[in-house]
Amino acid sequence: MGFTADDCARCRADFPALRTMHGGRSLAFLDGPGGSQVPLAVIRAIENVYATCNVNTGGQYPPSREIGRRLHEARRAVAALLGAAGPESISFGQNMTTLCFSLAHAIGRTLSAGDAVVITELDHEANRSPWLMLRERGVTVREVRLRASGELDLDDLASMIDARTKVVAIGASSNALGTVNDLELARRLSTEVGALLVVDAVHYAPHFAIDVQRLRCDFLLCSAYKFYGPHVGILYSRPGALERLPTDRLSAQNPAPPYRFETGTLNHAAIDGVRAAIDYIAALGRGADLRARIVDAMHGIGAYEHALAADYCRRVAALPGVRVYGPGFDRTMRAPTVSITLDGRHAGEVAAALGEQAICVWDGDFYAVRAVEVLGLAARGGLLRTGFSLYNNREEVDRLLSALADIAR
């Protein structure tokens, strides 16, 4: 049956933040790419940890065993979300950026001067800066060109992957333009030369079903706060991949995956919130097991968001002085993220005007600094970005378009 406007209406009641008012108007959170709101189930899960088992793991008493069980269940839930073989492939961290720096540092210790890493001009800096730092070790970093269409130059990608390439680091979807990259091509090219494939799925995970086993990536990173959870970073490691890396850890720390990449005491309450967020998504789908329900739900949610974003994109493009950036919505694989500029207007000025009308959108480069530079938009304040989540509806789209029409006059 998919995910419908009626489903959206029911879900909206689950998100307390949607009842927040500003100037007599309810806030329209159209800033999903920057982070989603959380349902009450996630809030209660976090609260329950602090109320009942706010202790460390590994103890010989009930609350310690309980929090250990919850962390295992959270890994199991993330494994189901990503299509991983099991919870031992799932590591948690402070955020995706910190995990990617740790991953790049560990991989970098295995590389030699003259080895090459491939990144892209389209990616968020969290999947660029950690790899660019490897230049200090004599590693060559090659950057795949971004075309004016908002898509990567795939011929350029193919030309950069050769026998010296040890890592291909690529985003699944652009947080600035909504572009969905050709991961199957990246995987095929990297496999041909024996390079590691590292995927940034932060902007992809909230909108599409992920199957890491089908993709056959070596590492995949995402962030729970983009899919209705708390601020927790997630690292998937292909079985056998993490064990080969030299990691910074305490001598007393468990060296086995998934603990090999986890330092100190984790944010137990937030991690249980991740589990609750995934359970919330799964409850919106149908299937015989958790994985099947997640996939079904993501297909429905993604189609709903795509239709909402496509309608907004078509209508906003018709406003005077508006230019839309990124691929069109005539394709199915397009994230529900729409970025625009208005002639003669700084993106921050427009975002502030919308904010006063209780409409939450984002402006700037969104840490996709290089992409905004390549598009020649840095001096204009970057882009005005709108992103849709499962709780957004057509009434909010109409509010946004009406406000933009007034600003564009």
Features from the language model and the residues they span:
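Pyridoxal 5′-phosphate
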Residues: 1-409
